[in-house]
Swiss-Prot record:
The gene is aspS. Its EC number is 6.1.1.23. It comes from Mesorhizobium japonicum (strain LMG 29417 / CECT 9101 / MAFF 303099) (Mesorhizobium loti (strain MAFF 303099)). The keyword Chaperone does not apply. This is Aspartate--tRNA(Asp/Asn) ligase. The lineage of its organism: Bacteria, Pseudomonadati, Pseudomonadota, Alphaproteobacteria, Hyphomicrobiales. Homodimer.
Amino acid sequence: MHRYRSHTCAQLRKSDVGSSVRLSGWVHRVRDHGGLLFIDLRDHYGLTQIVADPDSPAFKVAETVRGEWVIRVDGEVKARLSETVNANLPTGEIEIFAREIEVLSAAKELPLPVFGEPDYPEDIRLKYRFLDLRRDTLHKNIVARTKIIAEMRKRMGDVGFTEFSTPILTASSPEGARDFLVPSRIHPGTFYALPQAPQQYKQLIMVSGFDRYFQIAPCFRDEDPRADRLPGEFYQLDLEMSFVEQDDVLNTMEPVLRGVFETFANGKPVTQKFQRIPYDVAMRKYGSDKPDLRNPIEMQAVSDHFRDSGFKVFANILANDPKAEVWGIPAKTGGSRAFCDRMNSWAQGEGQPGLGYIFWRKEGDKLEGAGPLAKNIGEERTEAIRQQLGLADGDAAFFVAGDPKKFVSFAGAARTRAGEELNLVDRERFELCWIVDFPFFEWNEEEKKIDFAHNPFSMPQGGIDALNGEDLLGIKAFQYDMVCNGFEIASGGIRNHLPETMVKAFETVGLDRATVEERFGGLYRAFQYGAPPHGGMAAGIDRVVMLLVGAKNLREVTMFPMNQQAYDLLMNAPSEASPQQLRELALRVAPTKKDA
C-alpha cells in the first residue's frame, strides 16, 4: 500500500464496503458522540468520515488531534446506518473505522476558521491565504479558474489559434497606466518594464508571418487601487489575427467565449446571438459603454415634451443651451411616491440637486400622472411622455436635463439603481453583447487638447483621410468591447498597420514622428517591411471567472492577490532592497518626506 493513501477523501462508495484503505488529509472537524470520536477528514478532492471507537488502537491518537492537523488513517470501509447517511456528501453512505492513525503534521491554533464562509477582515485572510484557500468555496473557485482557462485553450486551438509566449522583460510603453520598472544590472541607469499588455509583441507576431496567435498573458500595471481591478497584475486571453476585418474577429470570438460561458454557466441561460451596439447608442440608451442588459430599462430623449412647458427649470435649460436635452428613465412598477422620493434622496446623495419624476396611477377609470412635474407640464404632455416610454398604471419615470455629456454617467447610474431597487434585473442569466464604433479621439479639458479615447494602436474608420479631415472628434475607431452583465470582459480592435496613418494619428495628439519612432521603434520599423491588415482582442480572465463562479470580487478568484493598497501581506512585498543589491544596480533610494 502507498505510504500515504490508497484513495482520496472523495473516492470511496458503498461498493467499497469491507475494503482496507489508507487516507491522508486535514482534520476538518472532530466530534465526540458518546465515546465514539468522529473525524471529518478532508483533502483537495472531498471529505470522508472517520470513526474511532474506544477499543481501537487508533483511539488514543484520535483523542489528541485538532482542527487542520494532517493525519494518515488506516481502516476498514463500513456502510453507515440508514439514519446517518449524508445525501449531500459523495462519500455520505460510508465511513472508515480507524485501525491506525498517524499524525503527519500538527497545526497551531488557527487565526481564522477554514470551514463555512467566515466574515473575517480581509487583511487576516490575505496574510494567512494558505489557510483561506482551504475553504471550500475559495478552493473550488481556484479549481474552476484552472478549468475555465483549459477550456479557453481548447476552444482557441479548435478554431486554428497557436499559443505563443511573449517577453516579460520589455521596453516601457504608454498603454494608459504606469509601468512597473525593473533596473538593469548589466546596463546601469537603464530599466526594463513589465508589459502592461503584449500589444506590440502580438502585432509583431502578425508581421512575422504567423496567422492566429493567442496566449494566457500576465499583464502588469502600476495603477492606483480600484474596486473593480486587482492591483499589480492580472491575466488575459490575448489574441491576434491576420488578414481580418472587424466582423471576422467578432464572428470568430463570439462562439469561443459563448461556449466557455455555456460550459460553466451551471444551467443559466447564455445569450446566443450577441447584439452589436454602437457606443453612441449604448450611452444614450443605458448611460454606459458596459450596460447590464439584464436590466430592461432603456432611456429616451423626451426634450420636446418639456420645451416651452410650464416646468420652467427644464424649459429654461433647453432654451438657454442648444446642446441641452431632457432624458426620461422609465421605471416599470416604480409608481409609488415612497419609491420616487427614495430615488430623489439617492440623487441628492450623489451630488445632484434631485431627480424629477412622474408616476402614474388610476383615479377611478382615468390614468393620471402625479408629482410636481406632471402638475407643471400639464395633462397632455404627461400623457405623451407616458405613451412614448410605454408606461402604465403603477409605473414611473425619472428625468435628467442638461448637456448629455455632463449628465450621462449619472443617468446611467440612476437606470442601474432603479433596476436593482425594483428587482427588474434577472440575475439568473448571462447577457452578453458587443459595443462597437468607439470614438477614436476625445477632448482633454485639463490640457485643452485632443487625446486618444481608447487604444492608440486601433485603425480609425476612414483611415488617413479621416485624420486629415476637420471633424476629428467625430472619427470612430475600429474598436470593440465585449460586455457581460454590466462588466467589460474583453476589448480589442483592428490595428493601424500603415506607418503613415500611425504617425498621423500620434501627431494629432501631439507626438511627432521622432517620438513615435523612439517609443514604438520596433513596431514602427516592422511596419516598413510589409505588415498584413490585422486585429485582435483580449478577454480578462479574472473577470470572466468572477462572473461564472458568482464571486463578489476579483480576489475571490485569485490564488495569491495583493490587498487594495497593492501590498502582499503573505510575502511582505514590496520590501526594501539591501545596500548590496542597490550597489549592484547602481541605484540610490531618495529619502521620502517622512525620512527627510
